[in-house]
Amino acid sequence: MPFGCLTLGEKKDYNSPSEVTDKYDLGQVVKSEEFCEIFRAKDRNTLKMYTCKKFNKKDGRKVRKAAKNEIMILKMVKHHNILQLVDAFETKKEYFIFLELATGREVFDWILDQGYYSERDTSNVMRQVLEAVAYLHSLKIVHRNLKNLVYFNRLKHSKIVISDFQLAKLENGLIKDPCGTPEYLAPEVIGRQRYGRPVDCWAIGVIMYILLSGNPPFYDDGDEEDSDSRDKNLFLKILSGDYEFDSPYWDDISDSAKTLVASLMEVDQDQRLTAQEAIAHEWISGNAASDKNIKDGVCAQIEKNFAKAKWKKAVRVTTLMKRLRASEQGDTGASGLAAGATGGPPDPNMPGGSLLAASIKTALSEKAADAQTSTIPSLPQPPAARPEEQQQAQQQQQAQQQQQARCNGDVPQMLPQRKGY
């Protein structure tokens, strides 16, 4: 049965579980991810191996939505640097997605095994990623969770493929829900602005930064046990574009590479380089990438930074922001007063909480005031308040927000089109 749309009132025609098992032999679970379990599957007729993703409907609405979304997107795309959809089934209890099997290693692991690694190797990787993303963007598809790059097989000149389209979305001017992996998030996602295809270009800039230095562009040096403070500081650094090409890690990297990274990691999404523009950059399409061996320095930093990191795990950023809000309210008990610290009420749609909202505004105002330097803004500390004052302030703020919503009609604005998209 083709996995397609049903007409209004038509009875749902599910696949039977035997349709799946009669065609494919599912092996043991290879790994479990946020939304699904991953299997190696063998076609019983051709004996060809595939990757199978199984989504259990009982795991909730988000899982069901992720499965349907990935199927919809994968049915739209066909590109040699994108892992292709082979088959899809929906039973009463599960979704099954069968994909091409990528047997190669992740790019980070590949680098660690090389005897020689240079900017030209990175340029080759980034060119393939940019071509895939430019193709997606031509279809108005936003991936929203670019990070895991793998080689399709273990041959010497294997291609790079991207996958994991559970969070991908068609750009219609209304994307605002935050999701993805925190360290790869663009400023507009954290700031709860409406966003679109430029978020993928930011993530590509983060990936390129890591591949050239072995370090993440944004990190917090604070107490690793205080996860809320660490995440908050990470978000503030991303919002203000607070990263450096620090020595000695960037000493041997060409100016052309640094220029491309900076253009992809431009805080203003309207000024950020598009995927197609990045492909035309001299470091990608020309001969600007250096062939100097940078393997030792990059590998040392990759092993140091990513052995204990959580970067490979996608999280719902909404959940993270809510946790920060709960922590802040527990510390200050003054969510209604933080508005006074910034001259106005925080965005009612922003789940990051009062202090995070104030910090965002502080970070952005400092960035605008001093475009030449990137500093970590100090967090405003609202004064302590009595419980009755807190309750009164919260009630007043809620009433103002409700009145504003009635006056405005909550009509969303369309995302302005950028040249090149």
Swiss-Prot record:
Sections of the chain in a coiled coil: none
The keyword Membrane appears for this protein: yes
MF (Gene Ontology): ATP binding; calmodulin binding; protein kinase activity
Tissue expression notes: Ubiquitously expressed.
Membrane topology term: Peripheral membrane protein
Residue ranges, compositional bias (Low complexity): 330-340, 390-406
InterPro entries on file: Kinase-like_dom_sf, Prot_kinase_dom
Top-level lineage group: Eukaryota
Region span, Disordered: 326-421
Keyword Membrane on entry: yes
Compartments (UniProt record): Cytoplasmic vesicle membrane
Domain commentary: The protein kinase domain is predicted to be catalytically inactive.
Known partners and oligomeric status: Interacts with calmodulin, in the presence of calcium.
Free-text function comment from the UniProt entry: Does not appear to have detectable kinase activity.
Name of the protein in its database record: CaM kinase-like vesicle-associated protein
Organism: Takifugu rubripes (Japanese pufferfish)
